[in-house]
Amino acid sequence: MSPPNQDAQEGRPDSPTAEVVDVRRGMFGVSGTGDTSGYGRLVRQVVLPGSSPRPYGGYFDDIVDRLAEALRHERVEFEDAVEKVVVYRDELTLHVRRDLLPRVAQRLRDEPELRFELCLGVSGVHYPHETGRELHAVYPLQSITHNRRLRLEVSAPDSDPHIPSLFAIYPTNDWHERETYDFFGIIFDGHPALTRIEMPDDWQGHPQRKDYPLGGIPVEYKGAQIPPPDERRGYN
């Protein structure tokens, strides 16, 4: 594969199309400590890469063109199904509308010129300050036939955390979707048995969300009461 076109690196975080979703202050996003190092004054933006321009470089253009053609046979326009195409760090990510995710995945798997027959699971991400798109599901795909890689990304709001399940297309996503539901609260519609897989069935909340409290128990040391971690300092 030839390297992606440098112009496509407009998808990088410092490009004009990049999206700032949060601003973190202090070292590791922690505030309220007795820091005297000066690192407590750090201010850092959390930035998501923006859309990349054509040509993307390498086999990326071929994937996008063939997927667009396959979707047209389904009477779906590529621009209606894919919100943006991002080339960042030599990787291709398609941000897909959640209601059209199964149709995009089906075409990626079944089209002879695409043949992304392997889905390596699904990962959840929580951006609490990205209003209306707080929850993200990320699917790494691999074409064993053509030795190509691709990533699909879908977003949903906290208020409506529903994303169509890909279990019928990639059955190996069974446990991965359960784990993402367990830890992030994303509801995969159509999954045959969407139950917790790591936490107890009666557990409250979803532990890998950014707004989930750290918890803990108070500790007594030499007569002093030390509160649980999430009450000692502020995390953003």
UniProtKB/Swiss-Prot annotation:
Claim: Membrane is one of the keywords in the record: yes
Keywords: Cell membrane, Membrane, NAD, Quinone, Translocase, Transport
Region called Disordered, residue ranges: 1-20
Catalysis: reaction(s): a quinone + NADH + 5 H(+)(in) = a quinol + NAD(+) + 4 H(+)(out)
Major localization class: membrane
Cellular location(s): Cell membrane
Listed EC numbers: 7.1.1.-
GO cellular component: cytosol; plasma membrane
Presence of the UniProt keyword Membrane in the record: yes
Pfam families reported for this sequence: Complex1_30kDa
Superkingdom per UniProt: Bacteria
Molecular function terms, GO-annotated: NADH dehydrogenase (ubiquinone) activity; NADH:ubiquinone reductase (non-electrogenic) activity; quinone binding
Topology of this chain in the membrane: Peripheral membrane protein
PANTHER family: NADH DEHYDROGENASE [UBIQUINONE] IRON-SULFUR PROTEIN 3, MITOCHONDRIAL, NADH DEHYDROGENASE UBIQUINONE IRON-SULFUR PROTEIN 3
Function: NDH-1 shuttles electrons from NADH, via FMN and iron-sulfur (Fe-S) centers, to quinones in the respiratory chain. The immediate electron acceptor for the enzyme in this species is believed to be a menaquinone. Couples the redox reaction to proton translocation (for every two electrons transferred, four hydrogen ions are translocated across the cytoplasmic membrane), and thus conserves the redox energy in a proton gradient.
HAMAP family per record: NDH1_NuoC
Assembly and oligomerization: NDH-1 is composed of 14 different subunits. Subunits NuoB, C, D, E, F, and G constitute the peripheral sector of the complex.
Protein family (similarity comment): Belongs to the complex I 30 kDa subunit family.
The protein's name: NADH-quinone oxidoreductase subunit C
